[in-house]
């Protein structure tokens, strides 16, 4: 049902804004909180912050397909057991962004190969999360998952 509602919303917004690049007008981000052995995978971005793999959804792209694509592009990993978490309405640099979060697991052993978007990666235990340079709302979610 979430997929259907999301697809309808994106289609309506693309008609209203008359653009194929809806992310310019109404940013929507999809993120995977990948858990492996009670540790969560985090990627370090260009702002030296820890983040989750993910990115922007394309027009008419299935939300789960977007997540699989973004995780593969950013980490070389395949994921499984996707579970939708509560969407978040956040502000980044004064811009409102809707973030759809999913928990996930690694589906097979593959080496992590980072894309140009990230400088480092690590798997963190629950006890290590509080000290990370990461938005507090992400920390709160991680603590409830692991």
Where are these regions (language model features)?
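A structural signal for short, well-ordered beta-strand segments
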Residues: 32, 84, 102-104
């Amino acid at each position: 049902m979430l997929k259907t509602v999301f697809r309808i919303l994106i289609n309506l917004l693309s008609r209203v804004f008359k653009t194929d690049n809806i992310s310019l007008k109404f940013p929507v981000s999809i993120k995977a909180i990948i858990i492996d052995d009670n540790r969560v995978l985090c990627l370090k971005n260009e702002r030296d912050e820890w983040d989750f793999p993910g990115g922007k959804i394309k027009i008419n792209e299935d939300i789960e397909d977007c997540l699989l694509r973004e995780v593969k592009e950013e980490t070389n990993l395949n994921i499984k057991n996707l579970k939708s978490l509560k969407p978040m309405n956040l502000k980044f640099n004064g811009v409102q962004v809707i973030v759809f979060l999913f928990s996930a697991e690694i589906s097979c052993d593959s080496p992590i190969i980072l894309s140009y978007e990230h400088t480092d990666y690590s798997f963190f235990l629950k006890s290590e999360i509080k000290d990370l340079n990461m938005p507090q709302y992400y920390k709160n979610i991680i603590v409830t998952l692991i």
